[in-house]
């Protein structure tokens, strides 16, 4: 038997029947090929005209170019894939047609004829309702007038089952552009067309009124809902609750919230955030906190908006400890803070003068490259000026000047805070340097800057510079206000007698009535006239300056050893209710409350109180309680570089008074009735206090 060959020539392997050409094969792994692929679920792939194998003249085995430009994928019509392929092909063409229609609509003129021509060209056949919705939604960036004209064309030419759907699409466009008058006009057209509005219509119109700031209109449209047989949903409730709150009708907002709860609506973060905001706006911060705790108790998880709203509310309430708790909870719940979160934290901590916390938030924002505008910077600088954070303020001020954004550069308030900071620490050179820098930056000194500068000069005893700064006020055409006059009065209280006339002249030129009272105070022969003039001054002054005026006048009396006039001022202040609840009495303790008083006012009050105690012992009408206490508060005093507690401790030692600082009650000095009685009896009434 002849042996079979181990291999055959390639030509012997080719089949003898016509085979599918290479051009009809399908290669999905090469989608970038320039060859076009035709998909057919009906036609068989075209047969090549030349089924013979490639000739020797084409050694690479490729087909002629006329046959290699087209690829065909034949899909069996009975295959499950056939319907999907057909839908995909049809959907692609429809999307392209609708996108082209939307583009044409956006490019045409805002006239009825232009819109009609564009849509007729795009839709030779009547479009469906869905086509109309897609085109109107896609063309949402177009002009509102064009959208309304397109709506009218679709209503007249499309196969529309529910006209209200198309109206709602255009109403949402008007809401986005905040066009209230156009919204009302389209509503009227809708009713004339006999179209019944639905819940989505009312929700859109109400939220449009809210977005336009027309909160009374939002409430008005909410009241129309029952007339058309519509019931509000959660979004509508939320929008109207917010509208009631902004309209100042917090009671109606809360009634609506209670109604939503009574009707078993599932509370969501949107409604809760809105109610919290209503409570915060009306000043009911406990109510805001209750809603926040209630939503968590029923399983509604607070989102970022709710947390930010609560942080803002508690910051307004001056409850920084609650702010810290909420922020800690927010971090524990893995809710990612936003820039608004950190702004709320800064607001809360700077207002409450939580220096360390505020600076920590500031540095975090700086590290995260968050935008810090001049308003936030100024809040930080104001806090630093009040609590004496010199190094921190200088760091912030350097950051402001180094900032690249124009919205972060120092303004007049920034310079004012820096001058106030240096003035409070009696750093004259730095205060003057900031003032010069302010002028070079193109800002004129305002009354706050000059007030701080005068206070600084007064602290270091530079009376001539006080007068020079007062002249700057007049040169700039600035009218002195009550705060400025109070500053001059404070400077006068610490000015030596030989230079007092210079400051009194400035006071008289700023406020004639105040200057007259100070002149009578200095004149030792005018006791009765001073009493009447001082009473009239305190009675006619604004409420916020009554106590500062009284404090400074009593300081001046004490420094000039005019105790009779100081007592007259205290009596007038108590009768006018300026000093309220200075003394409190219980069965176990009599207390003197001096917190907020200047040193001179506190010493005068102590003088009067101890004389009253001595009188009680002499008459025997009323025995002393087991405990006597003096509350001075703790920390720095507004009217002195030293705290009132430190001043009083030294003064009580000079008097050899038996009051001692309480170890468990900061700012309190206590004694027993036995020790007080022995000390009072050892002193004559006129010797009780030497001031």
Curated annotation (Swiss-Prot):
GO BP field: mRNA processing; positive regulation of translation
Pfam families in alphabetical order: PPR (PF01535), PPR_2 (PF13041), PPR_long (PF17177)
GO cellular component: chloroplast stroma
Annotated stretches, region: Disordered: 1-76
Ranges of compositional bias, category Low complexity: 1-17
Bias (Polar residues): 24-33, 61-76
PPR repeat locations: 163-197, 198-232, 233-267, 268-302, 303-337, 338-372, 373-403, 411-445, 446-480, 546-580
Residue ranges, compositional bias (Pro residues): 45-56
Coiled coil: none
Protein name: Pentatricopeptide repeat-containing protein ATP4, chloroplastic
């Amino acid at each position: 038997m002849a042996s079979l060959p181990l291999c055959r020539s390639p030509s012997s392997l080719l089949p003898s029947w016509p085979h599918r050409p290479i051009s009809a094969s399908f290669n999905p792994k090469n989608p970038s090929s320039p060859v076009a692929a035709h998909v057919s679920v009906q036609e068989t792939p075209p047969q090549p005209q030349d089924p013979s194998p490639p000739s020797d003249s084409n050694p690479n085995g490729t087909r002629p170019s006329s046959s290699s430009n087209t690829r065909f994928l034949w899909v069996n019509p009975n295959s499950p894939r056939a319907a999907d392929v057909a839908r995909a092909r049809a959907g692609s063409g429809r999307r392209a047609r609708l996108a082209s229609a939307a583009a044409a609509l956006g490019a045409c003129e805002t006239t009825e004829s232009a819109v009609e021509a564009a849509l007729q060209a795009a839709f030779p056949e009547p479009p469906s309702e869905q086509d109309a919705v897609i085109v109107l939604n896609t063309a949402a960036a177009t002009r509102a007038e064009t959208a309304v004209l397109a709506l009218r064309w679709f209503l007249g030419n499309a196969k529309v089952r529910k006209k209200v759907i198309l109206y709602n699409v255009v109403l949402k466009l008007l809401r986005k552009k905040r066009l209230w008058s156009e919204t009302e006009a389209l509503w009227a057209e809708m009713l004339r067309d006999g179209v019944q509005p639905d819940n989505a219509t009312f929700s859109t119109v109400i939220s449009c009124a809210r977005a336009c700031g027309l909160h009374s209109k939002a409430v008005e449209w909410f009241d129309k809902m029952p007339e058309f047989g519509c019931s509000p949903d959660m979004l509508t409730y939320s929008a109207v609750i917010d509208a009631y709150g902004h309209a100042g009708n917090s009671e109606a907002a809360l009634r609506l919230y209670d109604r939503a709860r009574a009707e078993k609506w599932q509370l969501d973060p949107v409604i809760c955030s809105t109610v919290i905001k209503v409570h915060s706006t009306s000043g009911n911060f406990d109510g805001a906190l209750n809603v926040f705790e209630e939503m968590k108790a029923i399983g509604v998880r607070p989102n970022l908006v709710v947390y930010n709203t609560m942080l803002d509310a508690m910051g307004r309430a001056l409850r920084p400890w609650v702010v810290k708790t909420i922020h800690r909870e927010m971090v524990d719940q893995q809710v990612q803070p936003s820039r608004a979160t950190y702004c709320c934290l800064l607001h809360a901590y700077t207002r409450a003068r939580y220096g360390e916390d505020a600076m920590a938030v500031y540095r975090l924002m700086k590290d995260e490259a968050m935008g810090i505008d001049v308003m936030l910077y100024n809040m930080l600088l104001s806090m630093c000026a009040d609590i004496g954070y010199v190094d921190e303020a200088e760091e912030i001020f350097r950051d402001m000047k180094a900032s690249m954004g124009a919205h972060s550069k120092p303004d007049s308030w920034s310079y004012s805070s820096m001058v106030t900071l240096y003035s409070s620490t009696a750093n004259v050179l730095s205060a003057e340097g900031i003032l010069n820098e302010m002028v070079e930056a193109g800002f004129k000194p305002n009354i706050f800057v000059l007030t701080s500068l005068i206070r600084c000069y007064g602290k270091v005893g530079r009376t001539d510079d006080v007068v020079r700064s007062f002249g700057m006020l007049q040169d700039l055409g600035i009218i002195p206000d009550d705060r400025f006059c109070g500053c001059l009065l404070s400077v006068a209280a610490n000015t030596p007698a030989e230079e007092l006339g210079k400051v009194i002249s400035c006071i008289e030129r700023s406020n004639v009535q105040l200057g007259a009272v100070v002149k009578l105070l200095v004149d030792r022969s005018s006791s009765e006239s001073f009493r009447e003039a001082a009473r009239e001054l305190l009675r006619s002054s604004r409420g916020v300056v009554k106590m500062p005026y009284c404090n400074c006048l009593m300081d001046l009396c004490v420094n000039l050893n005019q105790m009779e006039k100081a007592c007259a001022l205290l009596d007038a202040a108590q009768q006018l209710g300026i000093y309220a609840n200075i003394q409190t009495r219980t069965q176990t303790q009599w207390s003197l409350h001096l917190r907020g008083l200047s040193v001179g006012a506190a010493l005068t009050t102590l003088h009067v109180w101890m004389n009253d105690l001595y009188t009680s012992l002499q008459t025997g009408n009323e025995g002393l309680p087991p405990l006597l206490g003096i509350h001075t508060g703790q920390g720095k005093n507004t009217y002195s570089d030293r705290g009132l507690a430190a001043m009083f401790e030294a003064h009580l030692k000079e008097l050899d008074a038996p009051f001692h600082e309480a170890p468990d009650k900061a700012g309190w000095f206590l004694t027993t009735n036995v020790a007080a009685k022995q000390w009072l009896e050892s002193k004559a009434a006129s010797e009780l206090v030497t001031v």
